[in-house]
From Swiss-Prot:
The reaction(s) this protein catalyses: 5-amino-1-(5-phospho-D-ribosyl)imidazole-4-carboxylate + L-aspartate + ATP = (2S)-2-[5-amino-1-(5-phospho-beta-D-ribosyl)imidazole-4-carboxamido]succinate + ADP + phosphate + 2 H(+)
GO cellular component, one term: cytosol
Gene Ontology process terms (BP): 'de novo' IMP biosynthetic process; cobalamin biosynthetic process
Class of this enzyme: ligase
Gene: purC
Signal peptide: none
Organism: Neorickettsia sennetsu (strain ATCC VR-367 / Miyayama)
Protein name according to UniProt: Phosphoribosylaminoimidazole-succinocarboxamide synthase
Amino acid sequence: MRERRKIYEGKAKILFSFPDNPNLVTQHFKDDVTAYNNRKHSVIPGKGVINNYISAFFMQNLQNVGIKTHFVKVLNMREQLVKKAELIPIEVVIRNIVAGGLAKRLGLEEGMILDAPLIETYYKSDSLGDPMVTDDHILSFNWLKLSEIEEMKVMAWRINDFLSGALSSAGIILVDLKLEFGFYDDQIILIDEISPDTCRFWDTETKEKMDKDRFRRDLGGVSKYYREVARRLGILNGSF
């Protein structure tokens, strides 16, 4: 049997080749947690397992409502099989409530509800700190065509709408989320992950933070609240 090889290692995940099919890769979820462009780092045992299952849950449900994603299936507690997509170097952030970088950048009070979801785009580059870019930047540097930008944003809005509703029924507010996309078979698909690492989740009643802000802000209880998100979504089991 052919051995798999490491293709790429990021801050929170590793991609391995999938010898049985060159069009697929194995996505491995690490226990590492980072913030501020990797200037803050720790390891939280079990975090990768929780994020693997949470992301699989969201990806499967998004596919059920017609959103194309890279997800194929869960392989084990830490890994899932995904389509080998060509990365689009743009991160899409959708904000429903003022928090984090938006509050700091514009001097706004955290917790202010936006009249409509606000969409932002960032150039994906750790060395540059993922700078914000406009549609004109994206077009000027030929990262995407105008029709592709529009398609990506429509997908992002649909994802936000679906996740907001799903999380609301679990007593969780979707404050904001970061999405990544790629090309597969000449189509734009959702890639990467959807988890407390890539979203801001607040408890509906208490506004308690249930995401990576617990690590960023030294609030503690990262594992506890990640598990609580999984429990409320109905995917908590003995594996956790």
